[in-house]
């Protein structure tokens, strides 16, 4: 009924004239107006009116009230210097930054205050911890009532959700717990020995570099203001799915070569700590690895409540559904354009590991025609094709 979902908090109950009165705290809208049955309402005088009938009033109201930044919210206060150092893993953080750990408690807290993780209270005796600091450095997110922001890993038997093999709940902040997430996943992701260029090497069905970027991308682009949902990594026999809460701030077909992120400070520190690529290059890097290794390009699904990235194991062209073929075609076109080259029938045949026969050429021609009709690509120079957004 309500989108995004609202967390109603019951503050207290009172008995007045033998009647129970409950005090309920309703948080204000932050990233988008709240809709009821897909409609947004405004109070005009004494009446509730559809906001779409008063677009200018909605714009003015929203501009005045939408300056909320979750990263800056205070998640714990009245902490001593020692308590701050107990709750936040400054040692791992300093090590990742290459800093000297041999500092006084005051010097350490000063560094974290400069980085915007904590702030002194007005009396200068105690500290407040910002959501940014807790989300990155918490020993245990539960200490800050942020346990629902932790990364959850679910391993399934088979290709459906019907049989859960194992379920793992994260508890650490994203920065200090990131490598452990990768380490845990590595145990469950399939790999095999293959002869590559005459040498036996370990072949990863899901390259670690792609998994890292998809997880970092989910962390950076999640909607932190949403309640009751977390980042979820699901491993099936035939695919990996990574889901983050919140509607994407980027259009589905502009993930490539786009540098907009929802949580700017979170993204900044994830890059500083070498946990993800530079701004805007994460998806580009994923596509590059997929292209160079003839792997499935991740398929992204956007809804009003979440973004889901699906990464499939190898699959021959004949066994792919059309939606997956179009997805690979589009990102192949983007990649070729980014290296100052263009997609052709021949390059796309090679991408799908098809031969040069007329049936293969015809199948690729039909696929290109469908992508053109969907307005995902357009004609480039010399019988080539470029992404719809290319100049």
Residue locations for each model-derived region?
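Divalent-cation
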Residues: 1-41, 47-49, 139
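Short acidic, hydrophobic short linear motifs in intrinsically disordered regions
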Residues: 339-352, 382-383
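Glycine-rich/acidic phosphate-handling loop/turn and adjacent ATP-lid/helix
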Residues: 240-274, 315-336
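Short, cationic-aromatic polyanion-contact patches
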Residues: 379-391
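A short, conserved structural fragment
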Residues: 118, 296, 369-382
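Active-site helix-to-loop segments that bind/position phosphate- or nucleotide-bearing substrates
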Residues: 31, 39, 45-226, 235-238, ...
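Long, low-complexity, charged/polar intrinsically disordered regions in eukaryotic proteins
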Residues: 141, 273-321
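Short amphipathic alpha-helical interaction segments
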Residues: 355-370
């Amino acid at each position: 009924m309500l989108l995004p979902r609202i967390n109603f908090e019951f503050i207290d109950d009172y008995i007045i004239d033998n009647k129970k009165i409950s005090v309920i705290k309703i948080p204000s809208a932050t990233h988008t107006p709240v809709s009821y049955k897909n409609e947004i309402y405004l109070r005009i005088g004494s009446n509730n009116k559809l906001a779409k009938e008063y677009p200018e009033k909605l714009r003015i109201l929203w501009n005045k009230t939408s300056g909320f930044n979750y990263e800056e919210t205070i998640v714990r206060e009245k902490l001593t210097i020692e308590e701050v150092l107990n709750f936040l893993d400054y040692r791992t953080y300093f090590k990742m930054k290459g800093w000297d750990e041999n500092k006084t408690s005051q010097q350490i807290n000063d560094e974290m205050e400069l980085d915007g993780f904590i702030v002194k209270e007005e009396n200068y005796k105690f500290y407040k911890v910002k959501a940014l600091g807790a989300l990155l450095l918490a020993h245990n997110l539960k200490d800050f009532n942020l346990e629902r922001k932790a990364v959850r890993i679910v391993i399934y038997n088979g290709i459906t959700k019907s049989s859960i093999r194992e379920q793992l709940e994260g508890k650490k902040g994203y920065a200090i717990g990131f490598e452990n997430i990768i380490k845990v996943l590595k145990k469950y992701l399939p790999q095999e020995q293959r002869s590559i260029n005459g040498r036996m090497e370990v072949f990863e069905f899901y390259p670690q570099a792609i998994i890292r970027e998809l997880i970092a991308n989910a962390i950076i682009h999640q909607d932190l203001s949403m309640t009751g949902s977390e980042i979820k990594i699901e491993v099936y026999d035939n695919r990996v799915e990574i889901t983050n809460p919140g509607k994407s701030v980027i259009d589905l077909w502009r993930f490539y070569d786009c540098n907009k992120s929802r949580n700017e400070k979170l993204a900044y520190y994830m890059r500083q700590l070498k946990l993800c690529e530079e701004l805007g290059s994460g998806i580009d890097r994923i596509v590059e690895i997929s292209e160079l290794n003839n792997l499935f390009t991740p398929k992204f699904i956007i809804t009003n409540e979440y973004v889901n990235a699906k990464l499939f194991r190898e699959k021959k062209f004949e066994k792919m559904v059309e939606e997956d073929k179009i997805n690979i075609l589009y990102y192949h076109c983007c990649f070729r354009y980014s290296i100052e080259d263009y997609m052709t029938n021949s390059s796309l045949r090679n991408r799908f590991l098809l031969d040069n026969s007329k049936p293969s050429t015809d199948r690729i021609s039909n696929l290109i025609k469908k992508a053109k009709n969907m307005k995902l690509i357009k004609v480039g120079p010399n019988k080539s094709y470029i992404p719809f957004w290319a100049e």
